[in-house]
Amino acid sequence: MKKNRLLWLCAVLMMVVGMGSCSSDDVNNDLWGTWSVVGYGNDQDFHTGDNIVNTTRLTFHQGGTFDGYIWPNEVNGTYDRKGDLFSFTRIMSTQLGGQDPDRRLIENHIRETKSYKILSGSELRLYYDAENYVKFVKVN
């Protein structure tokens, strides 16, 4: 009887230790992959067009890093997320210039990101305030 209790206790301890090693970033891998911008704004006033679509692409990696481009500049850095809260903790960018006003706005909005939402696994919204967001679609 004591042997069974000891085995049971060991099994429970192993499960608890195993669960503690899973980080939320390992479980929430829905963000990982490449995303392309299709517009920005909110549900009532959404901006899109040829000067926006496919001009920004970000690839999020496991471990809180990302890379990509906000045309014509390459970007990379780190991000942090807890629940639906999201922030870019470091953004490095080349400074090639040539951005039109919409692309500058998108870059500023991305830098101001406070939360995120993934809809249907293929739409990413990076919210820069309570209702306005930059909308991405999953590329891969």
Residue ranges and their predicted role:
Residues 8, 20-140:
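Lipid interaction determinants
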Residues 1-20:
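Sec-dependent bacterial lipoprotein signal peptides
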